[in-house]
């Protein structure tokens, strides 16, 4: 089960990353002027890059769990750190961008859970959930992909800012 999931997740994550880069290229002129938009576009890229990388590493770790545990731990720390940095800069964003950015806070517990499971693989079993560690991580990765897709959609569908509004945010 886990192998099929991670094969599919890696493919989906990197396909979505490529599609997201098309969106960023399309909105580049508008977003390049806005520091918070550049940060948000990077956040979406990171969702897909981290979930895809974790999925690929899990496929290649074979009978060496230390490999996937290390990769998942590092990815979780990177995701959590990027999220915390994004929240530090939230005060510089216009109100409508802040609403989208606050949705990101939903992912902080997920990134921390990825790190916790990487450190203590029996965590799910310890709390009464009878899943293998990579199956538990698969659920968390699914939720991250779901939130990343929705975050990307919200940014993509956000109407263009008026010139005056984008100048106020700088």
Predicted segment positions?
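Juxtamembrane helix-loop boundaries in multi-pass membrane proteins
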Residues: 3, 7-8, 30-53, 96-112, ...
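N-terminal signal-anchor/start-transfer transmembrane helix
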Residues: 11-29
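Generic alpha-helical transmembrane segments
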Residues: 13-17, 46-51, 70-87
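Membrane-helix exit/interface motif
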Residues: 24-27, 51-65, 84-92
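Hydrophobic alpha-helical transmembrane segments in multi-pass integral membrane proteins
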Residues: 51-60, 111-128
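Non-cytosolic membrane-interface motifs at loop->transmembrane helix junctions
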Residues: 65-73, 98-102, 130-140
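Hydrophobic alpha-helical membrane segments
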Residues: 78-82, 101-122
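Glycine-rich, aromatic-bearing surface loops/beta-hairpins
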Residues: 117-170
């Amino acid at each position: 089960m886990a192998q099929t999931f991670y094969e599919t997740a890696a493919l989906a994550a990197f396909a979505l990353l490529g599609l997201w880069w098309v969106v960023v290229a399309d909105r580049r002129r508008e977003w390049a002027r806005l520091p918070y938009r550049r940060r948000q576009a990077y956040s979406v890229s990171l969702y897909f890059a981290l979930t895809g990388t974790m999925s690929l590493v899990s496929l290649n770790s074979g009978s060496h769990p230390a490999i996937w545990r290390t990769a998942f731990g590092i990815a979780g720390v990177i995701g959590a750190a990027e999220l915390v940095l994004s929240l530090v800069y939230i005060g510089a964003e216009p109100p409508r961008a802040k609403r989208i950015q606050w949705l990101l806070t939903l992912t902080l517990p997920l990134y921390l859970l990825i790190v916790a499971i990487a450190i203590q693989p029996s965590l799910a079993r310890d709390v009464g959930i009878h899943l293998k560690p990579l199956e538990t991580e698969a659920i968390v990765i699914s939720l991250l992909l779901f939130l990343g897709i929705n975050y990307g959609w919200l940014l993509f569908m956000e109407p263009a800012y008026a010139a005056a509004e984008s100048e106020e945010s700088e």
